[in-house]
Swiss-Prot record:
Gene, per the UniProt record: glyQ
GO cellular component term of the entry, any: cytosol
InterPro entries with a match to the protein in the record: aa-tRNA-synth_II/BPL/LPL, Gly-tRNA-synth_heterodimer, Gly-tRNA_ligase_asu
Description of how the protein assembles with itself and partners: Tetramer of two alpha and two beta subunits.
Family: Belongs to the class-II aminoacyl-tRNA synthetase family.
Top EC class, one word: ligase
UniProt organism field: Methylobacterium radiotolerans (strain ATCC 27329 / DSM 1819 / JCM 2831 / NBRC 15690 / NCIMB 10815 / 0-1)
Compartments, record wording: Cytoplasm
The protein, known as: Glycine--tRNA ligase alpha subunit
GO molecular function: ATP binding; glycine-tRNA ligase activity
PROSITE patterns the UniProt entry points to: AA_TRNA_LIGASE_II_GLYAB
A biological process term (GO) from this entry: glycyl-tRNA aminoacylation
Catalytic activity annotation: tRNA(Gly) + glycine + ATP = glycyl-tRNA(Gly) + AMP + diphosphate
Enzyme Commission identifier(s): 6.1.1.14
UniProt main location, coarse: cytoplasm
Length: 303
């Protein structure tokens, strides 16, 4: 298989494509997140008036989606390629299609469809008008026009593209099982598959997420993260009229932490339906407070 069609080659091509469009190519955020949207380069930078273009790979964790490595396309740990463009360019769809062509998808031979699917993140207090992109009947990407993040209206509106890298690679390579994906494009004994890299981790983390994660410790961690977030927001609050907030990002880290701990508790099955909504609201309140703090920083547009 050509290097370009390998899993890592796909990532490199997307990075090169979006760098050519003026995006800063960032690295994954160094915290456990449920989706690429949680990266502050998207959530926080979508707020405020300042222009922003960025692209990055983000490992994402959804503990409840683990299947002990036995499901061919369902994972508790997977990769997204995220693009955020603010203000939203008028040719976002054309840029997206050009990126598919760059990774080797022949747009004339394949059935490319956009299916309306508005996006919402209850924990981030965010929503947007969106479409899923289907290639020959398989969803491979989503693009969204952010209307609101952390409870604040997005002005200007930002355009966001999310590529599901495993699904996209399965489509490009024509494989039915994610663990059969060619990871590095090498031949013979040097060939590495997705399963070689991640199958054992999927098996082990599924056991952790469903069976072994210490729930008493997780409840404490949630409370600690919630308290730390509020403490940092208070400590960084402006001390004079017109001053800037000084700790929006450390506080947001704790919001991310609380969200992931909640997802682990949810996977362990120790949160009831009514409690679940309460926890979502608690994380949302943290996200809103962090968004308000961000808007009082230089990057958030404060004078």
């Amino acid at each position: 298989m050509s290097q370009k069609k390998s899993f890592q080659g796909l990532i490199l091509t997307l990075q090169e494509f979006w760098a050519a469009q003026g995006c800063v190519i960032l690295q994954p955020y160094d915290m456990e997140v449920g989706a690429g949207t949680f990266h502050p380069a998207t959530t926080l930078r979508a707020l405020g008036p300042k222009p922003w273009k960025a692209a990055y790979v983000q490992p994402s964790r959804r503990p409840k989606d683990g299947r002990y490595g036995e499901n061919p396309n369902r994972l508790q740990h997977y990769y997204q390629f995220q693009v955020i463009l603010k203000p939203n360019p008028p040719n976002l769809q054309e840029l997206y299609l050009a990126s598919l062509a760059a990774i080797g998808v022949d747009l004339k031979l394949h059935d490319i469809r956009f299916v309306e699917d508005d996006w919402e993140s209850p924990t981030l207090g965010a929503w947007g008008l969106g479409w899923e992109c289907w290639c020959d009947g398989m969803e491979v990407s989503q693009f969204t026009y952010f209307q609101q993040v952390a409870g604040f209206e997005c002005a200007p509106v930002a355009g966001e593209l999310t590529y599901g890298l495993e699904r996209l690679a399965m489509y490009v390579q024509g494989v039915e099982n994610v663990y059969d994906l060619d990871f590095n494009g090498a031949e013979g004994p040097d060939r590495i598959t997705y399963g070689d890299v991640f199958l054992q981790a999927e098996q082990e983390y599924s056991r952790h997420n469903f069976e072994a994660a210490d729930t008493a410790m997780l409840f404490r961690q949630f409370t600690d993260a919630e308290a730390a977030c509020r403490s940092y927001l208070a400590a960084g609050a402006p001390d004079a009229e017109g001053a800037r907030h000084r700790m929006a990002q450390p506080a947001y880290d704790q919001c991310i932490k609380a969200s992931h701990v909640f997802n682990l508790l949810d996977a362990r099955g120790v949160i009831s339906v009514t409690e679940r909504q309460s926890y979502i609201l608690r994380v949302r309140e943290l996200a809103k407070a962090c968004g308000a703090a961000w808007l009082k920083t230089a990057a958030g547009g404060a004078p």
